[in-house]
């Protein structure tokens, strides 16, 4: 019984993370960040996707908690969008949730689908700076 309750709480926690997503991508903000010479990260998600939530959590933790002390996050802009938003998905040629894009000098320098390994995401960030 105790294991069942723990499992239910775990599943509810994952679903709570899946609901915590919002579209932050705005074309004018993306264009301004790119023209200001910032590295721009764009991630796609879909409702109920726990992998998407994990990926977003890694990116937010890196920025908000300074996990990557050798990266200056004031030169990085992070946006996310719901992959069902066809206009944005088509703009970036994104077909799947958990697509992670990194742009530098207004050019795409990194693309992955489904990557939720913290070390690999951090490695991609470091390589893009």
State what each model feature region is:
Residues 4-5, 10, 18-37, 126-129:
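N-terminal leader/targeting and pre-domain segments
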Residues 23, 77-79, 109-112:
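Structural signal for short hydrophobic segments within the conserved structured cores
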Residues 35-47:
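Short active-site neighborhood of thiol/selenol oxidoreductases, capturing the structured segment around
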Residues 39, 92-101:
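Structural micro-motif
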Residues 44, 49-52, 100:
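The canonical Cys-X-X-Cys-His
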Residues 44, 69-86:
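Thiol-based oxidoreductase modules, predominantly thioredoxin-like and allied folds used
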Residues 53-68:
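Typically the conserved alpha-helix immediately C-terminal to a functionally engaged Cys/Sec
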Residues 102-129:
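Non-catalytic, surface beta->alpha helical segment in thiol-disulfide oxidoreductase systems
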């Amino acid at each position: 019984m105790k294991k069942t309750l723990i499992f239910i709480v775990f599943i509810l926690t994952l679903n709570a993370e899946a609901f915590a997503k919002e579209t932050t991508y705005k074309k004018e903000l993306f264009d301004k960040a790119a023209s200001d010479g910032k590295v721009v990260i764009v991630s796609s998600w879909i409702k109920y996707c726990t992998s998407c939530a994990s990926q977003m959590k890694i990116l937010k933790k890196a920025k908000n908690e300074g996990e990557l002390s050798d990266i200056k996050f004031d030169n990085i802009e992070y946006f996310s969008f719901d992959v069902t938003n066809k206009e944005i998905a088509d703009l970036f040629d994104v077909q799947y949730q958990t697509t992670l894009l990194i742009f530098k000098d207004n050019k795409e320098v990194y693309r992955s689908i489904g990557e939720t390994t913290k070390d690999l995401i951090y490695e991609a960030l470091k390589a893009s700076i």
